[in-house]
Amino acid sequence: MKKIITLALVGAMLSATGITAFAVDYPGGSQDTEIKTTVAPTFTVSIPADTTVAFNDLTTDFGSVTLDSARLAPNKAVQVTIESDFDLNNSVDNEAVIPYSLTATDGTDEETVDADYAATFRTAGEKTDLKINITQADWDAAAAGDYSDTVTFNIAYVDAAE
């Protein structure tokens, strides 16, 4: 019985050593292997906090829109658009409004924010400063009361303009 078990074990060991594994068929010469990875885009944008405008102030700092951090593809950018009706609405009387405008300053360029406005950022640290503007005539015409408006900041990952 020992001889049969010994022969079986020797046979199993000999057959195991005869197995060769191949990862790639190698015809000779050189072969290339490609290594790939994907790095997903990431970014963080800061927008202005809630702001109170003092009565009779013609210009109030609204804060800034800032691209705090960014890992973008070379041909991409982060775009921020602003939606508002640009009217401060009286909390009691919907007909009573105080019109206002927003001014965006990017470096030395200043423009009035409207429906077509878009700030485009490509590098972390870029920012656009915003100001709220109300004319003295609009303050003088305002009824007493509390006023508010909501400004919506839309943030998108877009193709960069060349």
Which positions does each model-derived feature cover?
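Sec-dependent N-terminal signal peptides of Gram-positive bacterial secreted proteins and lipoproteins
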Residues: 2-23
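N-terminal small/polar-rich segments of proteins
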Residues: 22-96, 116-162
